[in-house]
From Swiss-Prot:
Xref: Pfam families: RNA_pol_A_bac, RNA_pol_A_CTD, RNA_pol_L
Keyword entries, A-Z: DNA-directed RNA polymerase, Nucleotidyltransferase, Transcription, Transferase
HAMAP family reported in the protein's UniProt record: RNApol_bact_RpoA (MF_00059)
Protein's name according to its UniProt entry: DNA-directed RNA polymerase subunit alpha
Family: Belongs to the RNA polymerase alpha chain family.
Gene Ontology biological process terms from the UniProt entry: DNA-templated transcription
Region (Alpha N-terminal domain (alpha-NTD)): 1-231
Protein's organism: Chlorobium limicola (strain DSM 245 / NBRC 103803 / 6330)
GO molecular function, one term: DNA-directed RNA polymerase activity
Record text about domains: The N-terminal domain is essential for RNAP assembly and basal transcription, whereas the C-terminal domain is involved in interaction with transcriptional regulators and with upstream promoter elements.
Length: 328
């Protein structure tokens, strides 16, 4: 029997300070010590685990290293790099992309000039100053945009196959601008040693504070579930049962590794899945229905078609196939 611990009835929201970018959330009452425990784990998950979009590198015509100056441009390359790090995006696209710009002076280069060639992303802080191109000068620049989690330093951000003159930059993927928590005492009945945890979350606008704490909570839950489901005793199986389990396991693994192109799908559905980088049945069933509907050109007709295909294999969306994935 597990001792019943005091738990919050719900998360309270401070409506007076709540905006699309800032939220103050209160969890109470908590057992003593759990305010700091939950505050720390939520803060770490929010800062390091939420996916986001950022500029990962650039290439400027006529520039071969990051400490150069550019003829006809007021700012040098280090200044431009610092400004590009501040550009914030909203994007559901999971693949990396590149956009090319040609800017002729007299011209102020702002973040709003960075436009996705295929609508992969949207710049949020369009007025952010990047550089000034002087009259008669031209700035040709390729900007590489990618998806990731947390923060990736430039030293680890140099993919193979990049052109000569590619300059990797520190990628700040996290959509969280700031997060902090405080812990105060609170009363339950006659006891005053319970705790109240107050969590302040500020985002860059690509995600709401409500969605950010919900996603962080789900990520944490997925990790602690491993401990909750742990059992120190193992069931005894006969050799024949072990063999049957192994055969079923291998059959499922092969099924999840089956290429999407082997399914009888329409050209439209194939193209949507390819753009979303969904290559196998395993990739497909790992997605949830609402996640698929967020992809470009993916509608309910395509969703119905995919459902019918999965039902043939007794599969569905939102499956956890972690144990079937190859390790190492």
């Amino acid at each position: 029997m597990i001792y019943q611990m005091q738990m919050p009835a719900k998360i309270e929201v401070d409506e007076a300070t709540h905006t699309d970018r800032f939220g103050r959330f209160v969890a109470q009452p908590l057992e003593r010590g759990y305010g700091v425990t939950l505050g720390n784990v939520m803060r770490r998950a929010l800062l390091a685990s939420l996916p986001g979009t950022a500029i990962t590198g650039l290439k400027i015509d006529g520039v071969f290293h990051e400490f150069s100056t550019i003829n006809g441009v007021r700012e040098d390359v280090p200044e431009i790099v610092l400004n590009l790090k501040k550009v914030r995006f909203r994007s559901n696209c999971k693949r990396n992309c590149k956009t090319s710009l040609v800017l002729n002076g007299q011209k102020e280069f702002t973040a709003g000039d960075i436009i996705a060639q295929e609508g992969e992303f949207e710049v949020l802080n369009k007025d952010l100053h990047i550089a000034t191109v002087n009259e008669g000068a031209t700035l040709k620049i390729d900007i590489f945009v990618g998806r990731g989690r947390g923060y990736l330093p430039s030293e680890e951000n140099r993919p193979d196959g990049m052109p000569i003159g590619f300059i990797a930059i520190d990628a700040i993927f996290t959509p969280i601008r700031n997060v902090k928590f405080t812990v105060e005492n609170t009363r339950v009945g006659q006891r005053t040693d319970y705790e109240k945890m107050i969590l302040d979350v500020e985002t860059d606008g690509s995600i709401t504070p409500d969605d950010s704490i919900s996603l962080a909570g789900k990520i944490i839950n997925e990790h602690v579930t491993f401990f909750a489901d742990f059992s120190p005793t193992e069931e005894e199986f006969t050799e024949e049962e072990f063999k049957q389990q192994d055969d079923e396991f291998e059959n499922m693994r092969k099924l999840f590794n089956t290429k999407i192109e082997d399914l009888d799908l329409s050209v439209r559905s194939h193209n949507c899945l390819r753009l979303a980088e969904i290559d196998t049945i395993g990739d497909l069933v790992s997605r949830k229905e609402d996640e698929l509907l967020n992809y470009k050109n993916f509608g309910k007709k395509s969703l119905t078609e995919l459902k019918e295909q999965l039902e043939k294999f007794d599969l569905k969306f939102g499956m956890d196939i972690t144990k079937y994935q190859m390790k190492g």
